[in-house]
């Protein structure tokens, strides 16, 4: 079973810019894909969020990793429930945070990624939301933030994957 990875904009940008922790992640990603142990999925959110920075060529990078594999354009019933639970968690448990422009896009992307993927990257705030609502456990997803320890942990995790989805 091939594991499916959702890469958020932070990870794509880090790889494109050659940031330290991400520089070592890209070869691990490509190796896991080449072994048949990992698939990467594109989303409509990637297209919207990449538009302001065409110089980084994020979509080209993503397409090179995904091979054209796409997430569903819209969340299914499980995805809509995930989105509702994340929005509720933000409103009721994290109400002190001021909303940002990309929040709705993040919720949309994560709603699909959590219900259709195995490994999901997101920012630390959204990881707190997902974990607070226990959506990672419910949907059996592994979360990785853009913080250096998580980026390094993802690299190690990718090296462990086999085409059958088992760790050696």
What role is predicted for each listed range?
Residues 122:
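Short beta-strand and adjacent tight-turn residues that come in two discontinuous sequence segments
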Residues 50, 104-116:
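Acidic, metal-associated active-site segment
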Residues 143-168:
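Asp-based, Mg2+/Mn2+-dependent phosphohydrolase catalytic module
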Residues 1-44, 48-65, 69-100, 128-138, ...:
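Short, well-structured N-terminal submotif of metal-dependent ribonuclease cores
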